């Protein structure tokens, strides 16, 4: 842990890596050198940061397998992000949670589709009944005896007072 916080140690390791790369690659003006140095620096930093963190996590945690798995997945995801990939590595637990969420969403959508289908079937049946009621049927002779307005017709002689009760009469209003 002391060496992790020691800036001189970290700088000396970076200088050592740079000197090693310069000795391996004879051409100091090589175009890929800054990228290689950046990757090696990131790997070194991850190495120095992850080992003490994992040691502390393993000592304090009871389930060491999950901690190691989580640390490794986090490190791999960090490396993938640094490399420019948008994909991420997931554990089985995360995959199962996502699958459960997807299955719940699919069930909800299937129930909605079922309700909509039932409503559409009911609407089609209603439209069929309305269409059947609106179809005009040809009738040769119209039976007027069943018409409502033809039942109780009285002539002027059949009225009791001899006057048409529906005829308006004069009304005088006092002022």
UniProtKB/Swiss-Prot annotation:
Topological domain ranges for the Lumenal compartment: 1-28
Topological region Cytoplasmic: 52-175
Positions bearing carbohydrate: 8, 18
Molecular functions per Gene Ontology: channel activity; metal ion binding; toxin activity
Cysteines engaged in disulfide bonds, as pairs: none
Gene3D superfamilies: 1.20.5.430
Gene source species: Rotavirus A (strain RVA/Human/United States/P/1974/G3P1A[8])
Protein name, per record: Non-structural glycoprotein 4
Keyword terms: Activation of host autophagy by virus, Calcium, Enterotoxin, Glycoprotein, Host endoplasmic reticulum, Host membrane, Host-virus interaction, Ion channel, Ion transport, Membrane, Metal-binding, Secreted, Signal-anchor, Toxin, Transmembrane, Transmembrane helix, Transport, Viral ion channel, Virulence
Compartments it resides in: Host rough endoplasmic reticulum membrane; Host membrane, Host caveola; Secreted
GO process annotations (BP): monoatomic ion transmembrane transport; symbiont-mediated activation of host autophagy; viral process
InterPro entries in the cross-refs: Rotavirus_NSP4
Biological function: Plays an essential role in the virus replication cycle by acting as a viroporin. Creates a pore in the host endoplasmic reticulum and as a consequence releases Ca(2+) in the cytoplasm of infected cell. In turn, high levels of cytoplasmic calcium trigger membrane trafficking and transport of viral ER-associated proteins to viroplasms, sites of viral genome replication and immature particle assembly. The secreted form acts as an enterotoxin that causes phospholipase C-dependent elevation of the intracellular calcium concentration in host intestinal mucosa cells. Increased concentration of intracellular calcium disrupts the cytoskeleton and the tight junctions, raising the paracellular permeability. Potentiates chloride ion secretion through a calcium ion-dependent signaling pathway, inducing age-dependent diarrhea.
Residues annotated for Ca(2+) binding in this entry: 120, 123
Protein biosynthesis among keywords: no
């Amino acid at each position: 842990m002391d060496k992790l916080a020691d800036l001189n140690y970290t700088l000396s390791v970076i200088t050592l890596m740079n000197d090693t790369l310069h000795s391996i690659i004879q051409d100091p003006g090589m175009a890929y050198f800054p990228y290689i140095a950046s990757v090696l620096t990131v790997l070194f930093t991850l190495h120095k940061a992850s080992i003490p963190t994992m040691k502390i996590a393993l000592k304090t945690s009871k389930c060491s397998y999950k901690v190691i798995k989580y640390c490794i997945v986090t490190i791999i995801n960090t490396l993938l992000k640094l490399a420019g990939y948008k994909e991420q590595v997931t554990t089985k637990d995360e995959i199962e949670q996502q699958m459960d969420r997807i299955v719940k969403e699919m069930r909800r959508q299937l129930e909605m589709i079922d309700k909509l289908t039932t409503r559409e079937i009911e609407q089609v049946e209603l439209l069929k009944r309305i269409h059947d009621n609106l179809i005009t049927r040809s009738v040769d002779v119209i039976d007027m005896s069943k018409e409502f307005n033809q039942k109780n017709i009285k002539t002027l002689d059949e009225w009791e007072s001899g006057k048409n009760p529906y005829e308006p009469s004069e009304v005088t209003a006092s002022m």
